[in-house]
C-alpha cells in the first residue's frame, strides 16, 4: 500500500494538485448520471441501427422540444433532420435552395445547434465535452460554446468568427461538426446485448460504428460466437458462417469487404452439386440474377454437407457434450433413402447420397481437407475481420453487470423446477454464473491459440452455438439437418429451455439476480428471442425484473413481432423502453416521412435524479477520492 501511495504522489506531486483533483472528482460525482442505451439483435441491419444512434432512439427530438418550447413542429422536424443526417440534409437543401439561400438557412439554424449542445451537454464537465470535439474545429467550437451570455464586445467577436468561417466556405463543415457532437452527447454508454452478426448484410459496418464509441460493452450472441470461433480456428464455425451468408445472400460481406476468397469453394460446389429448391437463398424482397441464385444454392449445399461431416467428427470426439442425437448419418437407410429419428422414419429430400463414402460417412476427402485449410488461412489473415473480432473480444463477454442491470443474450439454462441446469466438463459440474464464467474462459483461451483446431477450447464454440446447456442457444437441439433434408415439419421442432417460461416469474428472476450478486431492485436485460408484440406479448415481465429488448430489428422477424426493435434507455430519471417502427430510408427521414418511435413505456422512475456517485463508475471515483484524501492528509509520509 505504501508503494501505491508513493506512485500516486508521483502523479500528484503537490498538495494543491491533489486538492484540485479531489474537487474535480467530487464535482463529477454530483452530476446526473449519463444516459445508457441498451440494444440487442442487430443482425447486420446497419441502416436501421445507425438511424437509432443518430436520433438516440427518439431522445434528441424529445429534448429539442424541451429546449425550444416556442418552436413549431415543422421547425423541430427540420432541426431533427439536420442533426440526424447533417451532410445528407445539407446536400438535399442545396439542390432545393441553391448555395446562397442554403448558407442563410445554416446561419439561421447554427445558433440553435449551439444552444442545443449546451442543453444536452449540461450534465457533463467541460473537459468531457472538449474531448468529444473534432480536432479541426475544436478551438472554434469551444469559443462558440464557452460564454452563456456574451457581452457586446464578445458579440462582435463571435460574429467575426462566423463571418470568417463563411468566407472560407467552412460553414457546412462546422454545422456538421455541431450536429455530430449532439449525437455523441446524447449517448453516454452503449450496451449491445448480442448478435451483431446474422442474416443482415452489414455487421461489419455496425462494428466500425461501434468502434467509434468511447463507452461500450458487448454481450456475445450465438451468431457472434461463431465468427469469433472461425477466427479462433474452428473449421465448423467457419463453414457455418459461410453457409448462413449463402442462405441470406450476404457473401459480399465475406468476399468483398473481409477480402476472403471463396473461389475454390464455389468451384467445388459447382462441380459436385446441382440446384435443389430447398437450398434457394432467402432474399427478403431482393432480386438477384438466376446465375447468382444458382451459385448461392450450390454453395449452401456444399457448406451444409461439410458442416454436417465436421459436426459428426466433433460429437464423436466430445462425448461430454452429450450431442449424440446429432449423429444422423448412422440413421440413414441408403437403399430406401430414408432416415429414422426416434420411432419415426422420414423420406429424405435433396440429400447428396452420391457425395458420401458410406464406409466413412463423416470423413473428408483430400479435396475437402485442402479447401478447409485454405479457407481457414484466409479467414485468419483477413485484417479487417481480425480487427472486428479483436474488438468483440476486448469489449465483449458472456454477460455483463452494470449499474444494477444484468445483461446476457440468450438464457440462463434451467430445469423446469427452476434449478440451474448443470454441465459436467472434466470432473467439474458448472451451472448458473459459474457456467457462463467457464464458457468465457474457454473462449478467451481458444482465441489466444488460433493454430489449434480440434482442442476442447475450440470445440466449445460449437457447443455454444447449438449445445443443450449453452446460454447462447437455449434449446434442446438444432434441427438444421432436418430443415434441409426432411419435408415433414414435425421433425423441425426445437424445444426451448424452460427458462423462457420461467422468466415470467418474479421469484425466478430474483434467484438469477441473486446468483450474480444483485439485489431485488435490479433488472435482467435479455435479447435473443423476438417479442411477439402484435400478438399481445409484453417485453416487460416478472413485475419489471425482466426486460426483453429483442423486438425484431431484422426485417425477417418484423412480421412476427409487429415492430422493429426496442431500445432500453436508462437516464438519471429512471428507465424507459422504446419500441420502434421499421426504418424505411434516409431519404424518407429527410422528407419527414419516417418517425421511427412507436411506443414508449416507462419501466421505472426514481424519486431523485440518479447522480454519478450512485453508479458503478461513481463508486470507483469515490474510492479514488478517498485515496487522494488519505494522501493529502499524510503527504509527508510518502
From Swiss-Prot:
It comes from the Bacteria. Pathway: Carbohydrate biosynthesis; gluconeogenesis. The keyword Hydrolase applies. The keyword Hydrolase applies. It is an enzyme of class 3 (hydrolase). Keywords: Carbohydrate metabolism, Hydrolase, Manganese. Pfam families: FBPase_2. Its EC number is 3.1.3.11. SUPFAM superfamilies: Metallo-dependent phosphatases. GO terms for biological process: gluconeogenesis. It catalyses: beta-D-fructose 1,6-bisphosphate + H2O = beta-D-fructose 6-phosphate + phosphate. Disulfide bonds: none annotated. GO terms for molecular function: fructose 1,6-bisphosphate 1-phosphatase activity. Its cofactor is Mn(2+). Belongs to the FBPase class 3 family. This is Fructose-1,6-bisphosphatase class 3.
